[in-house]
Amino acid sequence: VSKKHLFNLNEKIKEKYTCFELEIENLDNINLNINSWLGESENNDVKKTISVIKTNKLNIDWLIIDHYAINETWENEIKKYVKNICVIDDFTNRKHNCNILINQQINEKEIVKYKNNINSDCKICVGNDYLLLNHQYYQLNINKNIEKLKRINIFMGGSDIYNITEQIIDICYDYNKKNNLNIIFDVIVGKSNKNAEKIKNKI
């Protein structure tokens, strides 16, 4: 289930999977505030998602949620229509009600940050062991000798709303200059990156 956001990947998803698209009520109200990214209230969004489940008579064993604007309000409603919920989370400041929560950004010592924000029977999976990475990358021979490093790939996600990419480029250029190096930096930006042209002109 996916929204019809600008620069969405729905058509790509449809090449291999079934994709149920939801209309966005108010595209103009979407801004840097992650709570606006659904394009409407959580209540309206979850009702539409439940309608998809009912209309298509879907029997869902696992519902995987990957969206910054969704929290326990949405999950409490959908829980009645699915067997299990897995949440992919990058933050620790929202309440969730799920069976499994994955946060690859923190380590085990930081799980305490979820105190009072997660149901007690939730399995919390954190750290690099749960890194969501294409299996092809795991098959690569990683060169751990930094001194021989010649090329670095930079990618900060599809939208990079805070333009971290440009900040990293500046740091990389400074590092090259200060250390008299000639490391090549390949920069990748997503279609929804509003600073794409600015970044392109910079490099």
Predicted segments with their positions:
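Short internal beta-strands
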Residues: V1-K4, I184-K191
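Short N-terminal targeting/anchoring amphipathic segment
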Residues: I50-A69
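Conserved nucleotide-sugar phosphate-binding/catalytic loop shared by glycosyltransferases and other
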Residues: S2-S51
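Nucleotide donor/acceptor-binding cores
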Residues: D61, L149-I152, I183
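Conserved nucleotide-sugar donor-interacting segment of glycosyltransferase catalytic cores
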Residues: A69-N116
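Nucleotide-activated donor-binding/catalytic signature segment of Leloir-type glycosyltransferases, i.e.
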Residues: E197-I203
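A nucleotide-sugar donor-handling region in carbohydrate enzymes
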Residues: N97-Y162, G190, A196-E197
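A conserved mid-protein helix/loop that constitutes part of the nucleotide-sugar donor-binding site
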Residues: S159-Y173
